[in-house]
Amino acid sequence: MLADPRRSAPPASLDLSAAREVLGRVWGHADFRGLQSHVVAEVLAGRDVMAVLPTGGGKSVCYQIPAILRPGVGLVVSPLIALMTDQVEALKQQGVAAARLDSGVSMEERSAIWRAARSGELDLLYVSPEGLAAGSMLERLSEIDLSLIAIDEAHCVSQWGHDFRPDYRSLGRLAEIFPGVPRIAVTATADARTRDDILASLRLGEARVFVDSFARPNLQLSAERKINGSRARTDAAVVELVRERRGKSGVVYCGSRDGCERVAQTLRDGGVNAIAYHAGFDAKDRDKRLERFLAEDGAVMVATIAFGMGVDKPDVRFVIHADPPGSLEAYWQEIGRAGRDGEPAEGITLYGPSDIAWSLRRLEGRPMAEEVKQVQTRKVRQLFAMLDGAVCRPQAVRRYFGETDAQPCGVCDICGDPPATFDAVVPAQKALAAVQRLGERFGRTRVVDHLLGKTKDVQSWESSLSTWGIGADLSLTAWRDVIDHLLFEGLLVEDPNEGKPIIRLGDSESVRAVYRGERPIQVRKAPVRVVEAERPRRNAGRNLAAEALDTDVRARFEVLRAWRRDRAAEQHVPPYVIFQDKTLVEIALSEPRNLDALGRISGVGAGKLERYGKDVLEALASAN
């Protein structure tokens, strides 16, 4: 049994005024947002907390500020080296004593970090769950005065979550190893069941739970149906979408490594600075590719889910899913890479029936308990029901996460151009009956032809069926949309059948409910296709704050960006770690003439003012 760590009681005078002072001095912000102040107050008081805050909602501040104010070192458990590196570099730029321990840290650096931790020189120490489980790390941590333990991306703890990692399950023992040390678990994506699992697994039974709104008002969401599952057409659609946003930083998610490299190459052939990223590259190569994306303006990362949480670049203007993820949690997490600076951004998803079939087959191949598999299957269907539905997309997602009072966002594709729908209960009954009468042994095209009474070389056994030709009242396109919608709803299921997909009936009780007329079915009429020549251009993904500047202000902004790029290259850090675009815009607009005026701009904390203030003023002067 490891010894209990030493821990000093927090000073009685510690309150939110001190936290606000740190927020202003270090981060350059006047006050907290949303539930941040409530979470910070609980941790400062030494109480356990679980916080579910939206991506870009400042989750890390909720444990970073208490770690700075409370005596000792704040231990942060984070799932990815890239994520740790990003946060540690940002903290160092702000004058906070932070360090990380991972496979990329040399023995000499490790020794220096442990010395700093023991001597009280360190505010925050970042480690991975694997690192905690290996060697003597826990023993060494027991010799340190810990101010708190933060578990970042806490959804990784839960088997019900979208990114379950077994090593996270062992973090519950920290409650016994470090009794009395307050713990905070933070995540951006956890439904009620996942939240309960996190609390139980981490032994946070007495924790205060804070769940903020999942609203991301700066994100414009849209989804577009793929055509006939054609990979070439989907690739062409992705290329067109990216070209429309040329010069903007973005992320394109693909479902496979081959698709990732193919799309990246196609974009490069078209003059786009596209970078492929997937788990097939070795660690050093992935690090280099990530560094390029973080450092280069207008770069587009084409990635598999291996990219996931490993980026905190604030000026990503769009996220495109060439292939949908596996759940609404994963969807919200991944589109959350866009617009973290609060400026307008886009989340665009391309989807089709073959995608849901692929997602379900992938689940079948994973070793998991039957109950878990059923839950994950339901999550897949809930995602596709949202994508193919006619309800405001953010509203649907927010209600899924428990915000029952969520209202339409007013900016997604559904709100901007509400799709026409038709009552498809009777067509659904006909389609289900046709699949059943045909013995559940044909594919989508054959079923539609059967409903229309147009099967080539029809045999007498088929033409004698009661369902032959009963769908002549609908068009070919309408029937395809009905069948697709039934697949998305799980009323029909597609089996691969050795490369010749067939469709069969889905959940029997749900099918019976349709037959009885107890389940409403609304199908969208003729959805917009992704490869139409005349696609309306969107502007939600544009950095309006920067692009709307007049000529003189724009010139100052570009000079500041060039200065930032040079400083970032010298320090081998991403440019946004020095200053975000929106901070540079404020500087260009206000033209501060002295350090006091510069220090009053949001995003310019005391550390950055001291480090860069004179250089910024000189750069401004040169622009004039």
PLM region descriptions:
Residues A41, A200, Q333, I348-G352, ...:
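Generic alpha-helical structural context detector
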